Each structure stands twice: as C-alpha cells, then as structure tokens.
Regions:
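Beta-propeller blade termini and top-face loops
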Residues: 1-185
Length: 185
C-alpha cells in the first residue's frame, strides 16, 4: 500500500521513528536525476515530512528555521534518549536567489548543513555547515544515551558532543567511504 507519493522524480530515502511514540515518523523525499555522466540532486520533490498517525497523513516541515530554498538529500535521526530532539543533514541550494551585490555583506549564507530541532520538528537551528558530498552519504546517528552526541557521514564521518556546534573528524586515517553507521549502546 502506497502511503505517500510526491512525484515521479522523487522517492523516499530516509525515515526516523520517534522512540517514545511509534505513530510519529519523519521521512525525507529526494528528487534526483542521474545519468551516466551527471547527477542533478534536488528539486521541488525534495522535502522533510512528518506524520503523527502512523502514516495516514503527512505534513511537510517548512519554516521555523528549516531551509526554505530548494533542497536535495536529507538524512534524519531522532535522539533515542530524548525524542523531541531531531537532526537533519540537509543538502540545500546554496544560492536561493541571484546575488546582485558581490560584496561579503551581499553574499548569501550556505544552507547545507546539520540542523537540530529540540521541539520535535517545530523549529530548527542550523548547527554547522559540514555536509560534504551530501547526496552520497547523509547518514545521521545519535548516541543512544546522549542526545547531544551526534555523528553524520559526509566526507569524512564527523561527530559532535554539543549537538553539532563543534565538529570533529571521527575517521582520521581511515578511508572516507562510509555508507552506514551503528552506535554500540
């Protein structure tokens, strides 16, 4: 049974369940076109969605600090120890509007990065802009006991002990190709 359809160009690539309420799910749709010599990542079909009725209805998460520009792949995680805390690793258009003033004050900030919500997705704070090669990895994992210790795979695997404010490399000296993560509880 199909429970959510966005478009013929988009599919769902990540889902995270609220550990305190299995009826609450977050899912990310990703619009992309890949050919033998190109990848177009992002478009109107890329979005973050939430359901509180086990998928009967879905609402797109918009506003509240979440990027309003064109998005690409979005990785998701809900903190097991505090289900109000949700992380999203967002690939987003870095230039949502033409920049007319090329001075530093006129430049637009990049929207790519790790976002954190402390209120189950109602509002979002951009924690950092570390999202290298987002379309390829975009895995986010939260320590089962500490909602502020978060890991995310880009190039390389990064981690933070303060909810994403401070970023450290978790894989120094190890090849950068990491497609899955698991945290030993």
């Amino acid at each position: 049974k199909r429970i959510k359809f966005v478009s013929d160009k988009a599919g769902f690539v990540d889902i995270a369940m609220d550990p305190a309420d299995p009826n609450t799910l977050y899912a990310s749709s990703w619009e992309r076109v890949r050919g033998p010599y190109f990848l177009k990542s992002g478009g109107p079909g890329s979005a973050l969605w939430k359901t509180t009725d086990a998928g009967a209805t879905w609402t797109e998460i918009k506003g509240g600090g979440f990027p309003a520009t064109t998005k690409g792949r979005i990785g998701l995680a809900v903190a097991p120890s505090n289900s109000k805390i949700v992380y999203a690793l967002v690939e987003a258009d870095s230039m949502p509007n033409p920049v007319k003033n090329k001075s530093p004050k006129g430049r637009q900030k990049l929207q790519n990065g790790l976002y954190r919500s402390a209120d189950a997705g109602a509002t979002w704070t951009k924690m950092n802009d570390h999202d290298e090669r987002p379309f390829y990895y975009s895995e986010v994992r939260v320590d089962p006991k500490d909602p502020n210790r978060v890991y995310w795979s880009s190039t390389p695997v990064n981690f933070s002990d303060d909810g994403g404010k401070t970023v450290r490399n978790a894989t120094v000296g190890i090849h950068v190709d990491h497609h899955a993560m698991w945290i030993d509880p």
